[in-house]
């Protein structure tokens, strides 16, 4: 009897002790920072693997935020364009003195602006334009997908009103709206290009840009505006943070703006949550163990190395730009068909690394020249070059095409006596034709003489590269049936 009583008493003590320990663990967990809680459920090896995957997925998203911060949030930024939901344009002629943007585009002056369509859609109004003038509004979501275009190749050059809606708007198209385009994210970036025919056309382009406008749908309809959506607590951008552990704090914020995983991303988001990255936005790198912190740093380095390697390989493909920019569906197909990848994250990241906001292939492609026909680097201090188009083999473009020269060291335009930085199809009547009506461009540091100067693209006294731009490429250019001719060195035109 005494023994049984002793057993019962001790059993009660054990049960009580176990309950107290369990309660202490629960209370301790409640007071623990989310990041610290996560580290108990993940090994350093797992953390590094997830960090690498997160980096490749999130790199273009974080770089997109960098643009958002400098263009529309930080009014002290030299790149500040204006607030959200306001069209910001700059019609000007770029020269060698412009050093802020590398590989600048002299064909189509830009408008660049951010839109917040969380509370309600915005209505974009565009004027009627001459049928020969190319223009478009490239619309980019937070993932950096080109989810839609408004412009010459998609909607024509008639005047119109285009409704840009976020993921939560599901009403019918209002009367008076030309078309509706839908973003899967609540913030949208636009790169707007309007063709410039030459220096004498600049005032006309300015007038066209001034007539682009945005307004909330409720303003257009004359109805009461919906309740405002709280403004996010935008984190200040720190340059260089995209290359170290600070990256994960920005990714955590952007995951909050995304709100929920896209189709096919649930497993990735579950993995992100194991690092403490979630829509709640409570990631805390300092709360992680030293081992987990080092694992995340290693994941960043590993992820960036993979992005760099993929980008380097892509530069050897003249049609790379046609494969790495586009809609979500297009990039998913391209990843599988062209690169045998299950996900498109690496395509988006490599594209963001080499140049954010490239066009979808149907709008423009950019064959680039870094080497000559003998695969040797281009250097005008050693050689002159010719680029020859047969009469029936000009670049196949629905709108127009151009060839632009860049200094190989600065990646900028080259100072030259003609103030000429490109040759394009809008001045075809000015070019000198060969015996078989072929078109031969001359690329050299010295003038080929007055008679051939119309065909001369001045080069620096040193290394250079050139970029061909085809706006509205024909199927032959997209399929590879037409390929850009090679640059021949020291060949007389």
Regions found by a protein language model. Give the residues of each.
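Bacterial N-terminal signal peptides that target proteins for export
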Residues: 4-18
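C-terminal motif of bacterial Sec signal peptides marking the signal peptidase cleavage site
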Residues: 26-29
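A compositional/structural signature for long, glycine/proline-rich flexible linkers
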Residues: 31-493
